[in-house]
Amino acid sequence: MAKVHGSLARAGKVKSQTPKVEKTEKPKKPKGRAYKRLLYTRRFVNVTLVNGKRRMNPGPSVQ
């Protein structure tokens, strides 16, 4: 039988310690065709070019 790392008495320790944050209400994301349209505009229309390359998530320091 395989060994476990630590005793099972400590299972879920970190989750019980973290403070509960209520989920905020956000506007609903478009579904289906509308979502694909949003992705197209994000990727190909508002292109972020850095050093001649497309960056998906450029940081604020990148010009």
Swiss-Prot record:
GO terms for cellular component: cytoplasmic stress granule; cytosol; cytosolic small ribosomal subunit. Pfam families: Ribosomal_S30. Belongs to the eukaryotic ribosomal protein eS30 family. Coiled coil: none annotated. GO terms for molecular function: structural constituent of ribosome. The modification Phosphoserine is found at S16. Its main location: cytoplasm. Present with 37600 molecules/cell in log phase SD medium. This is Small ribosomal subunit protein eS30A. The modification Phosphothreonine is found at T48. GO terms for biological process: cytoplasmic translation. InterPro entries: Ribosomal_eS30. It comes from the Eukaryota. The gene is RPS30A. It is found in: Cytoplasm. Residues 1-35 are annotated as: Disordered. Component of the ribosome, a large ribonucleoprotein complex responsible for the synthesis of proteins in the cell. The small ribosomal subunit (SSU) binds messenger RNAs (mRNAs) and translates the encoded message by selecting cognate aminoacyl-transfer RNA (tRNA) molecules. The large subunit (LSU) contains the ribosomal catalytic site termed the peptidyl transferase center (PTC), which catalyzes the formation of peptide bonds, thereby polymerizing the amino acids delivered by tRNAs into a polypeptide chain. Keywords: Cytoplasm, Phosphoprotein, Ribonucleoprotein, Ribosomal protein. Component of the small ribosomal subunit (SSU). Mature yeast ribosomes consist of a small (40S) and a large (60S) subunit. The 40S small subunit contains 1 molecule of ribosomal RNA (18S rRNA) and 33 different proteins (encoded by 57 genes). The large 60S subunit contains 3 rRNA molecules (25S, 5.8S and 5S rRNA) and 46 different proteins (encoded by 81 genes).
